[in-house]
């Protein structure tokens, strides 16, 4: 087992990484506030792992709260089901919520923990690659609104993150690829040598090689922990973690939450960010193409939806958390391994990026 630390003073917490951690009570029990535990999970994950977790926490008063699965259910009505379960089982302020599932479960359980009786403790047990390398670390919680993704939420840190890498054995291939989008992101924004490692090990990662996955998860979590420790509330460098997300959130919102997985939308959005960085003269074609090829090798979509116009993108991007004073800011790349958050770009460069024929571009890159 590896242990990393998110350094936030009195609110610091560990990230445990290893196979079989669902059975390791010592990773969870020290972080429980009291005897009451509510496990928030979904209809897909519950049959796989809920019983094992219940056995690990034997001796505690455990309330399972099983939600419908998917981004389409990341809204107020589903959040209300968590509160219903807590209140019906008479959970008090010394309860601990455990999020057992992917990013949707983690975001909603964390938001419920932030709100319930004005704040109770919670633990993240992420079971998808995307949630293990990204959403479970850093305390971003929330739900979607019909007009924009993750627009309602709170910064609320967990007491621990427990990453059982063995849960990836049950992950569908499409979900694995979606998680790789966020892994690749770390290489693009802050760790260029990691891109080389990913190019070497991509086949092993997609084949669920345990050693390769553990290394990728640890490097990703370490990168995120460093950024969160410096900028918890995204006033500066943390925003670089949103590479591809402004374009990607527009895709998710326009296409209907769940039609594209979050990682798929981030991949297509990252391609657009790479292209815009090239148009601004920061990346050469070879650097842009290197990033795109890696996303392709991960089995990810690299072409935005054909039915989305430039105006569709601009309309959704106006409702983005990085908009300040009415000005759109984007995460772009000065070079591979160095990201910047900027609103200082000519609109023509953005318009040209949105107007690019990405299907033709991919044909050129593949020849």
Swiss-Prot record:
<keyword id="KW-0170">Cobalt</keyword>
<feature type="binding site">
    <location>
        <begin position="69"/>
        <end position="74"/>
    </location>
    <ligand>
        <name>NAD(+)</name>
    </ligand>
</feature>
<dbReference type="GO" id="GO:0009073">
    <property type="term" value="P:aromatic amino acid family biosynthetic process"/>
</dbReference>
<dbReference type="GO" id="GO:0009423">
    <property type="term" value="P:chorismate biosynthetic process"/>
</dbReference>
<feature type="binding site">
    <location>
        <position position="182"/>
    </location>
    <ligand>
        <name>Zn(2+)</name>
    </ligand>
</feature>
<dbReference type="InterPro" id="IPR016037">
    <property type="entry name" value="DHQ_synth_AroB"/>
</dbReference>
<keyword id="KW-0057">Aromatic amino acid biosynthesis</keyword>
<keyword id="KW-0862">Zinc</keyword>
<comment type="pathway">
    <text>Metabolic intermediate biosynthesis; chorismate biosynthesis; chorismate from D-erythrose 4-phosphate and phosphoenolpyruvate: step 2/7.</text>
</comment>
<feature type="binding site">
    <location>
        <position position="140"/>
    </location>
    <ligand>
        <name>NAD(+)</name>
    </ligand>
</feature>
<feature type="binding site">
    <location>
        <begin position="103"/>
        <end position="107"/>
    </location>
    <ligand>
        <name>NAD(+)</name>
    </ligand>
</feature>
<keyword id="KW-0456">Lyase</keyword>
<comment type="similarity">
    <text>Belongs to the sugar phosphate cyclases superfamily. Dehydroquinate synthase family.</text>
</comment>
<keyword id="KW-0547">Nucleotide-binding</keyword>
<keyword id="KW-0520">NAD</keyword>
<dbReference type="GO" id="GO:0005737">
    <property type="term" value="C:cytoplasm"/>
</dbReference>
<keyword id="KW-0028">Amino-acid biosynthesis</keyword>
<dbReference type="GO" id="GO:0008652">
    <property type="term" value="P:amino acid biosynthetic process"/>
</dbReference>
<keyword id="KW-0963">Cytoplasm</keyword>
<dbReference type="GO" id="GO:0046872">
    <property type="term" value="F:metal ion binding"/>
</dbReference>
<dbReference type="GO" id="GO:0003856">
    <property type="term" value="F:3-dehydroquinate synthase activity"/>
</dbReference>
<comment type="function">
    <text>Catalyzes the conversion of 3-deoxy-D-arabino-heptulosonate 7-phosphate (DAHP) to dehydroquinate (DHQ).</text>
</comment>
<dbReference type="Pfam" id="PF01761">
    <property type="entry name" value="DHQ_synthase"/>
</dbReference>
<feature type="binding site">
    <location>
        <begin position="127"/>
        <end position="128"/>
    </location>
    <ligand>
        <name>NAD(+)</name>
    </ligand>
</feature>
<dbReference type="InterPro" id="IPR050071">
    <property type="entry name" value="Dehydroquinate_synthase"/>
</dbReference>
<dbReference type="InterPro" id="IPR030960">
    <property type="entry name" value="DHQS/DOIS_N"/>
</dbReference>
<dbReference type="InterPro" id="IPR056179">
    <property type="entry name" value="DHQS_C"/>
</dbReference>
<protein>
    <recommendedName>
        <fullName>3-dehydroquinate synthase</fullName>
        <ecNumber>4.2.3.4</ecNumber>
    </recommendedName>
</protein>
<dbReference type="GO" id="GO:0000166">
    <property type="term" value="F:nucleotide binding"/>
</dbReference>
<dbReference type="Pfam" id="PF24621">
    <property type="entry name" value="DHQS_C"/>
</dbReference>
<feature type="binding site">
    <location>
        <position position="262"/>
    </location>
    <ligand>
        <name>Zn(2+)</name>
    </ligand>
</feature>
<dbReference type="InterPro" id="IPR030963">
    <property type="entry name" value="DHQ_synth_fam"/>
</dbReference>
<feature type="binding site">
    <location>
        <position position="245"/>
    </location>
    <ligand>
        <name>Zn(2+)</name>
    </ligand>
</feature>
<feature type="binding site">
    <location>
        <position position="149"/>
    </location>
    <ligand>
        <name>NAD(+)</name>
    </ligand>
</feature>
<feature type="binding site">
    <location>
        <begin position="167"/>
        <end position="170"/>
    </location>
    <ligand>
        <name>NAD(+)</name>
    </ligand>
</feature>
<keyword id="KW-0479">Metal-binding</keyword>
